[in-house]
């Protein structure tokens, strides 16, 4: 491994550890000093006092395969030995990577060298394969979901190879399914919601402890538990996870996970102190008027290990664009969770124009406002009024900025802001529901958003992701489970029960219809289809079965709208605002734990 490789690899983790260490020492040295509560982003170190550096060492070499044996990795991926680039990224070396890299340099010069044979001799596919399962067509969808949790469950990774790309986790967890045989950050929140309704609270706690472990090791929650995901995160739902567990186990959970909440916040705000107006650094952006908001980012500017060939080809097809800039933006697209969507494209239609790092997204900033509020609550429960008030001020300042900067009068909805061109992107997406979900929107804005969503995004099968049919998976005509849930909860919070129920029941029909025809629940659905339950397309890989967050959201919606459980056919599921008590639900769908809406206040 070369020194430049180590240097590039270590930048994120070294910086995060140094920031955390600085914050920790600042808390010890200046515990009695006044706190900047202006909310403008200054004094982040002071605001998140008592943050110790990450306390756990990584049990594996936390270096992605493309940096451990770069020449071999590139050659294998570009030779297209495997249909899916992720296959080689997940293969386990049988000996130290440095030895394999040296052996490759010697072997490839020999006559009759076979790259495929070399890979077979030196790597093995992961043994953590999916459990054999054939769905029972006579089983109702609730029982199917409750059965699938065990199929998608993975036990603690006690025997992981030190050379594997897998980052071992100490507790059991749920994977999404199919090619995704590792934990994913934002997927897991929606999985946890469903687990609660299935009476699997202990597993929900295990999931939370796994994410806390990742923060304690690496200073942040990576995209997933793979070395090649360490350079980025995903939409920050950790605070929501803490709240979900606290609803069952009490407010002591906030104090228990306060150190990890602090580190999560430090990761997203790193680089904000002293950032000049009109500049961006890592995840933070200070607008020309001094407003501090956040963006998605990735520390590396190279092809993604899991989509290596695709990224190289995209760069080759776009020679006029700097490849490093393109690759960083493709990686940042992975951090958005919306990989990919016309939402992120400079021209609104072409992947090669992806420009995530120029955009201040509404969803990310709403989640960070919720994180700030959660930190404030944790501080108050600890009796730390000064820091609680500081975080409350930060949350209020951010919420005001969202209502002011990210409100698009042209769309009559919330949108994203291009801080480079100093203008809104004017692209309507389902992310407009995030300010409702987190309680950031004003009541008038929420009412306007509801009308816009009903008019522009509501489809026969649920809520469409965007209005653009680009061929990308996070665009029309596709609908995704998490966005349906966020919309339903947000609309319910702002007294829009009819639209919330319409979205929920249409989505339930789509899921149940597909399940009745195939015995499966899948990653995404075509919500434009005249016939409910048509599978979706688009994306860099085939449609995935399983599927973690689809199962979780459906399980919750069947509890929130119990009248849908009794329908024997999708066509029998009622639509509209009719109220039906939970007692009307069948025993199979009765909630094991009552899911409460967020405690976040609603703006006037």
Which residues make up each language-model segment?
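N-terminal signal peptide c-region/cleavage motif recognized by signal peptidases
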Residues: 24-28
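Extended glycan-interaction surfaces of carbohydrate-active proteins
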Residues: 72-182, 206-212, 218-221, 225, ...
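Extended, well-ordered alpha-helical scaffold segments
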Residues: 144, 200-211, 252-269, 371, ...
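Aromatic/His-enriched, Gly/Pro-containing loop or helix-boundary segments
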Residues: 215-257
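Long, repeat-rich segments with strong aromatic
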Residues: 355-384, 391, 476-486, 490-494, ...
